[in-house]
Curated annotation (Swiss-Prot):
Residues 10-145 form a coiled coil. GO terms for biological process: autophagosome maturation; late endosome to lysosome transport; late endosome to vacuole transport via multivesicular body sorting pathway; midbody abscission; mitotic metaphase chromosome alignment; nuclear membrane reassembly; plasma membrane repair; protein transport. A motif (Type-2 MIT-interacting motif) lies at residues 168-179. This is Charged multivesicular body protein 6. Belongs to the SNF7 family.
């Protein structure tokens, strides 16, 4: 019981699975960063409007420069996300290709084993024997067909028709035994005696 429950199951998580998970986590973090930067850009744009209304043009200009730099960061972040997603797709497709290759390898191994069991020579021998059997049967059919004349064929058909007619005309044989018949001219007292003689015989 201890061995049964104490044995650890072998992990099916591969290095490729770990890499895909890590790449997706980085992608999600970049998207969160994008969202945060986008919200900040909206606030700074509103603040720049307020500064211009207040006549603080230089301050508004400086704020817009910062905003422009953050927009460039946002574009670079989008490119990084695209690269991460492309990498994830490449790894996943490579995993599919590996599965296909494993299937092809297994199929080739099965074919090789089957070829070892039945070689080309064995297949050719079986085909030759089959062809010989077919040819032998064809020769027999030709001999049988050539050994009868038209008169023989007519006689065979006539006999077949006669047998068929006999089967039609013959009465059916009763399946139950016939009842014992006692002659009417025998006296009544003598009838039991006659029945005993019949039974004794």
């Amino acid at each position: 019981m201890g061995n049964l429950f104490g044995r650890k199951k072998q992990s099916r998580v591969t290095e490729q699975d770990k890499a895909i998970l890590q790449l997706k986590q980085q992608r999600d973090k970049l998207r969160q960063y994008q969202k945060r930067i986008a919200q900040q850009l909206e606030r700074e744009r509103a603040l720049a409007r307020q500064l211009l209304r207040d006549g603080r043009k230089e301050r508004a200009k400086l704020l817009l420069k910062k905003k422009r730099y953050q927009e460039q960061l946002l574009d670079r972040t989008e490119n990084q996300i695209s690269s991460l997603e492309a990498m994830v797709q490449s790894i996943e497709f490579t995993q599919i290709e590996m599965k296909v290759m494993e299937g092809l390898q297994f199929g080739n191994e099965c074919l090789n084993k089957m070829h070892q069991v039945m070689s080309i020579e064995e297949v050719e021998r079986i085909l030759d024997e089959t062809q010989e059997a077919v040819e032998y049967q064809r020769q027999i059919d030709e001999l049988l067909a050539g050994s009868f004349t038209q008169e023989d064929e007519d006689a065979i058909l006539e006999e077949l028709s006669a047998i068929t007619q006999e089967q039609i005309e013959l009465p059916e044989v009763p399946s139950e035994p016939l009842p014992e018949k006692i002659p009417e001219d025998v006296p009544v007292k003598a009838r039991p005696r006659q029945a005993e003689l019949v039974a004794a015989s």
